[in-house]
Amino acid sequence: RNNYEVWMIDYPGFGKSTGKRTEPIMYDDAATLYKMARAKFSKDSIIIYGKSIGTGVAAQLASISDCKRVMLETPYYSIDALMKHYAFMYPVSWLAKYHFPTYSYFKKIDAPITLFHGTNDEVIPFKQARKLAGENPGVELVTIEKGKHNNLNESPVFHQHLDALLQLP
């Protein structure tokens, strides 16, 4: 679709991948995939796309790698902020296995950033994306009314914006 090759990672513990899953390993896996892509494509041809847990990884990669654009679907501000939403009375940042401070990477991203998020996301509250959008002045937040965590691809608004972005020079 739109003449793009799509390269994806199965993080350890997801899909058919095995092995230990840690935040640094996930960052390293993304960097390795980026290096492989750069061997074949120019930086101006690479779009870094992350979904859900992968949005923090994608943001970190985009903060240290040149690319054409960054697209994040159902992003979170940070895992700590997300955990505080669910367990607001506990010191969750001390207990968290991952932190993925997505917001901290946004200030270092030079490429255009587009966020896709549904207003009825039952996993990552929409307010996380809205807060994240404020971390970089050029962020475009595409709001999918009544969209949930795993159904944004069913929305015509999602496809219209995605297709328009993929056709940009």
Which role fits each region the language model picked out?
Residues R1-K40, I53-G56, A62:
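Membrane-embedded segments
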Residues T55-Y105, A111, P156:
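Hydrolase active-site cap/lid region
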Residues I46-T55, G118:
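Conserved alpha/beta-hydrolase "nucleophile elbow" surrounding the catalytic nucleophile
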Residues K108-D110, L115-D121:
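Short beta-strand/loop motif that positions the catalytic acidic residue
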